[in-house]
Amino acid sequence: MDEREVYVPQTGNTQAKTALLRRQLNLRDTFFMSFGGQSPLLSILTYGAAVLAFMGYLSPVALALGTLLVLLNGFVVQRLSNRFTSTGGYYTYAFNALSQRVGLQTGWMYMFYSVLYGCAYVAGSAFLLNYVLGLPVLLGAVLVLVPSSTLVLLGVKPSSKYAVVAGVFELLVILSVFLGTVYLAHFHFYNPGSYVGGANTSKLALGILLGASIPTGYGSVAPVSGEVVDAEKVVGRVMILVIVVGGGLAALLVYGFMNLSVVSGTPFLTEGGAPIVHFFSHYFGYAATLLLIFAAINDGVLATVAFTTASSRTLFQMGADRVLPHRLSSLRNGKPLNAMLTVVIAYFAVSLLVLVRLQAFTAFVALGIASALASLFIHIAANASLFRLSLKRVTRRVSVGLSDLTSTLGEIPLAFVATAFSALDLVYSVLSAVPIYVYIFFAWIIAGYIYADAKEILGESDQNTHGEGRNE
């Protein structure tokens, strides 16, 4: 029999009760869905190229620091996922731990993050297909969007099966390429620290932001918690494992390319928007490059599947709680079809419109930076959620006794440090990013506040109208 739960938000509105989705994802499925959301190989060829442009030979350091930032936030979200196992992820955490209004704003920003982050991978895939094979950019985007949308509409289980097969293949490709760079470098290794003086350290915050965009793909798993078997244990473990594996592999592979560049004396930091592809082709040949591109495009499909699924589950729960139109929470054959169709349309619209207006790599960078800023925003909200919950638990436990207090006390500095690190990188990234990306980011925040205010005013108006009717 299908396992179902009832999620009751803290609004006291009994009409908001809703049956959640069937739990059918095990640990392996969840890991590879989240790993697919990271898309390490495509991330290395796209986000990695952007980090290289900013940081040069310090790129592995920026990637490692980006992974550390994501890991801090990941530990916070892990603790929250142990407490909240229903659908919705970051939105659900803020909705229950902080307030309905903050939850709405967090869900609003998560939609911005997840749609733009997924569309960035569509743009990255389109760029690589155009760069290597000469395919028109819009055709390349459609080649990613159509199969990914089909998988999403088929359901989370078929998507997870595809993610497992594709993820194993990708792991083998990444490890093989790294070992190949080590072999070609004759097992010599360079020290990134010796290049600090020649690096553009003023762009370090932006380099960390882009570096963090690779492992931050783990954020696709939290919204699907309601479909994970034994979510209280599985989701948190998967988050940390995916961050370490995905971020570690990305830093390792970029280091391998940089190491080969240093040892061989062959620079590749000026090769347009695809230095890694160019360098790979130079050393491994065109046939191997085609294999790399195939794996990267497969990554684009994986990332789009993971984040389209995550976006639709967030919309589904927001509709169920009536902070967005309730129709978004309707189920058909056990799937949130309205939410899924809404997100699929958004992916097609954003990807194609941006690629019509901008060059593919520029579109990727724009979408990537804007989504990364939003990622920091929602993680600050998650950190605040854990901070408040931990303070409340400490207060309760001190009043009744000190048993099991140590782990809760440890959550407070964890949330504080993660918030400080995220806020610092957010501020410095805003100051160093291209202004138009920042304007779009803040415009979406303002739009969310306007929507929340309008909803609140209309809600009060409805209450007053009903009250007057009863008085009559």
Question: Where are the model-predicted features located?
Answer:
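TM-loop-TM module centered on a large, flexible mid-protein loop between adjacent transmembrane helices
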Residues: 92-95, 99, 241-305, 324-371
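Helix-loop-helix connectors at the membrane interface of multi-pass transporters/channels
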Residues: 91-97, 121-141, 227-231, 239-245, ...
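Membrane-interface loop-to-helix entry segments
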Residues: 126, 137-187, 198-201, 216, ...
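Membrane-helix boundary/coupling elements in multi-pass transport proteins
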Residues: 109-123, 220-227, 286-325, 368-369, ...
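Extracellular loop-to-transmembrane helix junctions
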Residues: 43-133, 242-245, 251, 436-448
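Membrane-interface "cap" regions at the ends of multi-pass membrane proteins
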Residues: 1-58, 70-71, 75, 87, ...
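Helix-loop-helix junctions that connect adjacent transmembrane segments
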Residues: 16, 21, 60, 134, ...
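A generic transmembrane alpha-helix motif of multi-pass inner-membrane proteins
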Residues: 177, 184, 370-378, 403-472
